[in-house]
Design a protein with these regions (language model features):
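Active-site neighborhood of HAD-like aspartate-dependent phosphohydrolases
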Residues: 1-49
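Short, compositionally biased "basic patch" segments
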Residues: 44-70, 133-139
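Active-site phosphate-binding/coordination module
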Residues: 17-25, 70, 134, 151
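Metal-dependent phosphoesterase signature
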Residues: 57-91
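Electropositive phosphate-/nucleotide-binding environments in soluble metabolic enzymes
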Residues: 15, 37, 51, 55, ...
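C-terminal cap/substrate-recognition subdomain and adjoining C-terminal extension
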Residues: 1, 75, 82-225
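Acidic/polar active-site rim loop that often engages polyanionic ligands
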Residues: 18-21, 58, 139-146
């Protein structure tokens, strides 16, 4: 079956779950409210500008995971998903996912945001396969605060996707035959590799790149489109 790849933040979601999660942690008192929020905003601006140091960001984002018991993190995450993420789903995203599902495609969310935050979002959207940045866990399920494996960011998305395909071999499920939907300049490396790149509510850099390449540009937020 053909691959249908979807970025998550600002693509299927009308917002950024990673930034929102770190903001949420500050609001519930899990981290220093001012320092953490300011650093979170700085990293987000670097991400938007295409200059984010993903390893530095992972150290920042994974530190709170190691500082609190998993049971408490799970409780916070449930509240976060219910109150902030459900309303963040882009209005036309469920229909797009349904169209690919009905076509028999293999749906994959591929995101730089860590798996702890994004697994319940993928489940909520009914997407079976998630490729995300991984926070290291101990055998008891508690987090160490460290990154494990290749961050699923920029060129790292290509490497992680290749790993996924090696683990899920399918003659039709190749990168060259895949569709990929994204909003971000950071995903241009993978967009260049797939057979059907689609810019979704793109940032200015991706919008210009898509125009130059003749790629489709769509909105999952504009319900009148």
């Amino acid at each position: 079956m053909a691959l249908a790849l979807f970025d998550l933040d600002n693509t299927l979601l009308a917002g950024d779950s990673d930034h929102a999660w770190n903001q949420f942690l500050a609001e519930v008192g899990a981290v220093h409210p001012t320092c953490h929020a300011e650093t979170n905003d700085r990293f987000y601006q670097e991400y938007v500008a295409g200059v984010l140091d993903i390893h530095e960001f992972c150290r920042f984002a994974f530190s709170p995971l190691a500082e609190h018991p998993r049971a408490q993190l799970d409780e916070w995450r449930k509240r976060f998903i219910d109150t902030l993420i459900r309303p963040m789903i882009a209005p036309r995203a469920p229909r797009l996912l349904a169209e690919h599902r009905e076509a028999g495609d293999e749906l994959v969310i591929i995101t730089a945001t860590n798996q702890f935050v994004t697994q319940p979002i993928a489940d909520m959207l009914g997407v079976d396969h998630l490729i995300a940045t991984l926070a290291e866990e101990r055998e008891d399920g508690e987090f160490t605060g460290e990154l494990t494996g290749v961050p699923c960011f920029q060129e790292g998305k290509i490497e992680r996707l290749r790993q996924h395909l090696a683990d899920h071999p399918d003659p039709e499920g190749t990168i060259a035959q895949a569709s990929f939907y994204s909003d971000s300049r950071n995903d241009i490396p993978l967009l260049e590799q797939v057979g059907r790149p689609v810019a979704v509510d793109p940032d200015p850099t991706l919008a210009e790149h898509a125009r130059n390449k003749g790629w489709p540009v769509i909105s999952l937020r504009d319900t009148t489109a």
